[in-house]
Amino acid sequence: MASAHHSFAAFDATQVITLKGTVKEFQWTNPHCWLQLVVMNPDGTTQEWSLEGLSPNVLGRMGWKRNSVVPGDVVTVYSNPLRTGAHGGNMIKVVRADGTEIGAVPK
């Protein structure tokens, strides 16, 4: 997908990571939506991940709503990670605890 305002070069599109965690916040904002996810590590510590989505307009056309995920929801997120190794990425897909999948990139 071409983007008029910036590239997605910050993300490693050759990798897809899977993160299971609890939604801390979902920001339904322009120019991009953001999902803040708290992930539990095997040692019991937590990491907060910032996952960038497309615009509300694009996500809305894909079935998203501002309350598609809410704080406290347990979700699995598939993401292209940041190339820097920081805890962030580009959302590809979100799977709710009930197994419902919500795509985050147009097909």
Spans of model-derived segments:
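Short, structured beta-strand/loop micro-motifs enriched in basic residues and often containing a Trp
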Residues: 53-61
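Short nucleic-acid-contacting surface segments enriched for D/E, G, S/T with interspersed K/R
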Residues: 61-76
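OB-fold/S1-family single-stranded nucleic acid-binding modules
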Residues: 82-105
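A short macromolecule-binding patch
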Residues: 42-54
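Conserved hydrophobic positions within beta-strands
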Residues: 21-23
